[in-house]
Amino acid sequence: MSKDSVAKSKPHLPIMGVGPVYVISIILLSILAMIADKTHLHLPRPTSAPLEIFLFIVGLLFILSGLLIYFLAIKAKITSSIKENTLVTHGIYAVVRNPIYSAWLFICTGTLFLYGNPYLALMLFLIFWLSLTILMKHTEEKWLTKLYGEAYLEYCKKVNRCLPWFNKNNSPI
């Protein structure tokens, strides 16, 4: 029996994974941080028009990047691949292992830049990245390693977990 048919005969991963927990958490944290900053924290903000325009552009680029990543992930038809126990390593999955989660990280960070507070945006970006890293290491990465073994571990060596980047080893996946 081939490795593919063995994987297909195993129960598949949950379709949604831990995604809803992560996405809802970072959306709520973004909203709460903006409310807290407006009402209590009063973190310093840029006062020059060029810097405000720059932050707006950065925020817009983050949001557009997030939307593009999300669209490319949906286009990859990940749901059917999960049901078939197929490890997806092409398309957007060749540049980031968790594109849907990454898309939300970019969208929320972009929203914080549009809000106009670079300190809040950078601080929460790091929190979003760290929480995604911890969450993935302790959940989906364990599930995927158990399901795909060495193939998944090799994929992990070549492709970043959270932030889209070119293949680490410059080799085909």
Model regions and ranges:
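Short, amphipathic, aromatic/basic-enriched membrane-interface segments that mark the entry/exit
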Residues: V88-P99
